[in-house]
Amino acid sequence: MNQLVIQLIQLYKKIISPLLPPACRFTPTCSEYTIQAFRECGFFQAIQLSAWRILRCNPLSQGFEDPLPPNTKRTNLTHGRQTK
């Protein structure tokens, strides 16, 4: 499911985004942040992180460097190790 969302975002970046003026106030951009979240997190956590990020990206925000929080990597619950 995560891979499907990533492909949809990449399609948006290739087809729709070039038609719009640059608007993201953050580094990395909201689409790059969302792709990273879906690569490194579970589906529901990635949705939550991405939605919160997009809500913060508005004209009232100054914007700044905003990477994924450090403790967002998927964890294998049976062994406690990080998985990719």
UniProtKB/Swiss-Prot annotation:
Predominant subcellular localization, coarse grouping: membrane
InterPro entries: Membr_insert_effic_factor_YidD (IPR002696)
Keywords: Cell inner membrane, Cell membrane, Membrane
Highest taxon, organism lineage: Bacteria
Residue numbers spanned by region Disordered: 61-84
Keyword Cell inner membrane assigned: yes
Localization of this protein: Cell inner membrane
Polar residues biased stretches: 72-84
Entry membrane topology: Peripheral membrane protein
SMART domains in alphabetical order: Haemolytic
Gene Ontology cellular component list: plasma membrane
PANTHER family in UniProt: MEMBRANE PROTEIN INSERTION EFFICIENCY FACTOR-RELATED
Function: Could be involved in insertion of integral membrane proteins into the membrane.
Similarity annotation: Belongs to the UPF0161 family.
NCBIfam families: membrane protein insertion efficiency factor YidD
Protein name from the UniProt record: Putative membrane protein insertion efficiency factor
Organism: Leptospira borgpetersenii serovar Hardjo-bovis (strain JB197)
